Structures are given as C-alpha cells and as structure tokens.
Amino acid sequence: MSVLEASEIMQLIPNRYPILFMDRVDELNPGESIVVTKNVTINESFFQGHFPGNPVMPGVLIIEALAQAASILILKSEKFAGKTAYLGAIKDAKFRKIVRPGDVLKLHVQMVKQRSNMGTVSCQAMVGDKAACTTDLTFIVGATDSK
C-alpha cells in the first residue's frame, strides 16, 4: 500500500504529465528518506525519439525523477509546506544500467544535510537489485511562483 498516490503527489509538486515521473510514494520518513515507484511504460512520450527501435529512458529524466522524489521528501516537512523545491546541483551522477519499457524504477532518496532553505540528498534509482543511477542532488526551497 502506498503512502501517497499520484493525485496527492500533484498537490505537492507542480509537475504534470508528460513530465511527472512518479506513480506513487511507497515509503516516507519526513526529513529523512523516501522511496518512490515509477513504472516505465512504452507509452512514455520520450521513447518516440530515444531511441526508435531501441527504447532507452534518458538519463536526464532519471535524474528528474530522483529530483521529483527529493521534492516530495523536502516539501512534506512542515517548514517547507506550500513552497517549491528547485534543483540546484547534480553531483557525481553515474548511470550503471539502461532503463527500458517494462522496468519498475524504485527511487531511493536519503537526506544528507539541510541548512536553512538548502540541502543535499543522496539518490539511487534501482531496477530490481541493480542501481540504474546514483547521484547527489542539491536543492533550494523557495516561494511558489503563482504566475
């Protein structure tokens, strides 16, 4: 059973189809960690061009999925409720496994440090027991722009 479904996720972050890369939040320990599921299907719009006949999820979109999971982790804290988490930096990104249609991405994000409105998270995108991507992300929390 999930902690947050897609409709609840969309109440927290501004991303929508086709740039919403999570289906549900499976585990959430506010201020500490989150585990999110992204079911990768052949219907994803990016597979039309990446690559025809050899569909591969772009690495930058795996990073985006991890950033979205990190946003949920950050924005579920009382301190940042109603704000927006922005990606500030990507550090040491490594891509270790190709992600294809039919794969289930498990996005694991762990809070490393947080100060004021900035912080760092350690991330892993897993397919089964294999890491598809690992990285550290820096985030900045700001006001939600209503324009």
From Swiss-Prot:
It is found in: Cytoplasm. It catalyses: a (3R)-hydroxyacyl-[ACP] = a (2E)-enoyl-[ACP] + H2O. The keyword Transcription regulation does not apply. Its EC number is 4.2.1.59. The active site is at H50. GO terms for cellular component: cytoplasm; membrane. Keywords: Cytoplasm, Lipid A biosynthesis, Lipid biosynthesis, Lipid metabolism, Lyase. One of its GO terms (molecular function) is (3R)-hydroxyacyl-[acyl-carrier-protein] dehydratase activity. InterPro entries: FabA_FabZ, FabZ, HotDog_dom_sf. Pfam families: FabA. It is an enzyme of class 4 (lyase). GO terms for biological process: fatty acid biosynthetic process; lipid A biosynthetic process. NCBIfam families: fabZ, PRK00006.1. Involved in unsaturated fatty acids biosynthesis. Catalyzes the dehydration of short chain beta-hydroxyacyl-ACPs and long chain saturated and unsaturated beta-hydroxyacyl-ACPs. Belongs to the thioester dehydratase family. FabZ subfamily. This is 3-hydroxyacyl-[acyl-carrier-protein] dehydratase FabZ. It comes from Lactiplantibacillus plantarum (strain ATCC BAA-793 / NCIMB 8826 / WCFS1) (Lactobacillus plantarum).
